[in-house]
Design a protein with these regions (language model features):
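Substrate-recognition/cap regions that form aromatic- and gly/pro-loop-enriched pockets
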Residues: 318-455
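Glycine-rich, aromatic-lined ligand/substrate-binding cores of catalytic
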Residues: 219-368
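Sec-dependent signal peptide recognition
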Residues: 2-8
Length: 544
């Protein structure tokens, strides 16, 4: 039974396509003093809305079920805390935000009999913590007490004042756990994307917290024999290979490269040169990042770099789609090849950019900008951290991974994006116009909304929280309505690989009232050249 469980676990990792991306911005690295972090939760078939755990006082002796976040399988029970806090999505009422990416690590370190998984650690951590530091304590204590059953994991833990990265792995059959947490400097940005990121632990000029057995366990297993000061977490527990660098670290490299010249580390991201200079855990950006900068970073396809997939090569199809089918690697005539794996990817189940601000009342300061599909294909909707009722579109009765609903954001957004993907260069501008219009309206409204909420908060806290909750839900439902309109617009505008002309925001009609003659754009020139190069004279029209 144990062997079967481990086989399933490793199979899940191999087929997940290197899921998930997190970016982190310290408060002195942001334009307004916010701590910010992001999360793309990526996995094929993943259907997850906006979760909610209400604040509660629990009777003494209460127990809570532990259910594996990925498989929904029951693991066991643990004692419940006396008090738990309100959680909406991946942020709680104290603005604590926790995200993750899975990196796997050494297979023999997995403990399938462990009593708690990474997803449960995240949401219990959110329910029991007022700060990122407290979340580290809660999560590591739980893993040490009950055993950790997941693979190697990198966690992002942020609050309005601090940003941390923590990595954790089990210790196999003995049921223990090793972990290390690094505070990201306030003026820095960091990230992780399914490859362990913590290097030589003693080299970080910042706060470091780790398990007592972090080095001792590695020595016991014969994986590390050097001096303590030279202990390198990832080279010991999860050494980067080609995939770890090209599919994973390259996403972080590209994020960094948007904000500082990272050409020195390009060879590391390319993954071929084994002697390439390793990429730092964090960098200080040339300019401070705004919320909009970070949203743009979540939409990255390596544009403008040697890894770019928005080019005119044949992999993007006729209309230059900056997406590629999976699996990431494939074989042709006995040779193995691969596709790039950018941050923006079609298998995103949900995405967020979390904004945490220390100068505002906590329920106003924390905003989870949330969407239910690829970050490039959605408008990030503001969800305030004190909200207690989810928008229906993010929590739709009856909708799931195999049940479509036009009341559900995941399905409506995927409906649109899956129309756009194969005809990207034609159709994406229409989506982008709607997306940017919505996001710009949310951002322009934010100061006035929060000013009103602040005034209400001073007189009646409950009224202020209700106002923000209603505002979030209204914007989410507005987004859904606009996306439905976009879906019907796209099918009319681009029906049958033609383009219907417009005038003054309406489809043109003839004087007699029927639809105007459609345009037939044919192949883009770059694709036509490749097509003829491949087919030669097969389709050449003979001269009369």
């Amino acid at each position: 039974m144990k062997r079967f469980y481990l086989s399933l676990l490793l199979l899940a990792l191999c087929t997940a396509g290197f899921p998930c991306t997190n970016f982190i911005v310290g408060k002195k690295a942001s334009t307004d003093g916010s701590v910010m972090c992001t999360y793309n939760a990526d996995d094929y078939g993943m259907f997850i809305g906006l979760c909610h755990y209400p604040a509660a006082i629990h009777p003494k002796g209460s127990m809570r079920d532990i259910v594996d976040w990925d498989s929904h399988k029951y693991i066991g029970k643990i004692p419940e805390a006396e008090q738990t806090y309100n959680v909406i999505g991946n942020i709680n009422e104290y603005q604590v935000t926790i995200g993750e990416t899975t990196y796997g690590g050494r297979e023999e370190m997995v403990n399938p009999k462990g009593g708690i998984d990474y997803g449960s650690l995240i949401y219990i951590g959110l329910q029991r913590s007022k700060t990122a530091r407290e979340a580290i304590k809660v999560m590591t204590t739980l893993a040490e007490t009950y055993g950790y059953c997941s693979e190697g994991e990198t966690f992002t833990l942020c609050d309005p004042n601090e940003a941390w990265i923590m990595e954790m792995q089990g210790t196999g059959k003995d049921g223990g756990v090793v972990w290390c947490a690094i505070r990201i400097p306030d003026d820095a940005i960091s990230g992780h994307a399914n490859q362990s990121r913590i290097g030589v632990v003693s080299s970080y000029n910042t706060e470091v917290i780790h398990s007592k057995n972090m080095i001792k366990y590695a020595r016991k297993m014969g994986w590390f024999t050097g001096k303590d000061k030279d202990f390198n977490w990832k080279m010991t527990y999860a050494k980067p290979d080609f995939g770890g660098r090209r599919y994973c670290d390259a996403r972080v490299w590209s994020f960094f490269n948007h904000h500082k010249d990272m050409s020195r580390y390009l060879d590391w991201a390319l993954g071929v040169d084994k002697k390439a200079t390793d990429m730092p855990l964090w960098i200080v950006p040339d300019k401070k990042l705004s919320l909009q900068d970070l949203q743009k970073d979540m939409r990255d396809h390596y544009e403008g770099t040697p890894l770019a997939i928005d080019s005119t090569n044949i992999g993007g199809g006729i209309w230059q789609m900056p997406y590629r089918p999976t699996p990431l690697s494939f074989k042709v005539d006995g040779k193995e090849y691969f596709n790039e794996r950018p941050t923006s990817t079609q298998q995103t189940g949900f995405t967020y950019v979390s904004q945490m601000r220390s100068w505002l009342p906590r329920e106003i300061g924390g905003v989870l900008w949330f969407g239910n599909d690829d970050g490039n294909m959605i408008a990030y909707v503001p969800i305030y951290c004190g909200n207690t009722v989810q928008p229906e579109c993010f929590n739709t009765p009856g909708a799931d991974a195999v049940t479509f609903s036009d009341r559900n954001a995941y399905w409506v957004c995927n409906w649109v994006s899956n129309m756009v993907y194969p005809r990207y260069s034609q159709m994406f501008p229409s989506l982008k116009q709607v997306r940017d219009s919505l996001e710009n309206s949310y951002i322009s409204q934010q100061p006035a909304v929060e000013q009103k909420a602040n005034s209400l908060y001073e007189k009646n806290k409950a009224e202020a929280l209700n106002y923000l909750n209603n505002y979030s839900n209204q914007q989410a439902q507005q987004m859904l309505a606009r996306w439905k309109q976009l879906a019907t617009y796209l099918i009319v505008k681009y029906n049958d690989m033609t383009v219907k002309p417009e005038e003054n925001g309406h489809f043109k009609r003839t004087p007699e009232g029927i639809g105007a003659r459609v345009q037939r754009p044919g192949y883009p020139h770059s694709f036509a050249q490749k097509y003829i190069k491949e087919t030669g004279s097969q389709y050449e029209v003979p001269k009369e």
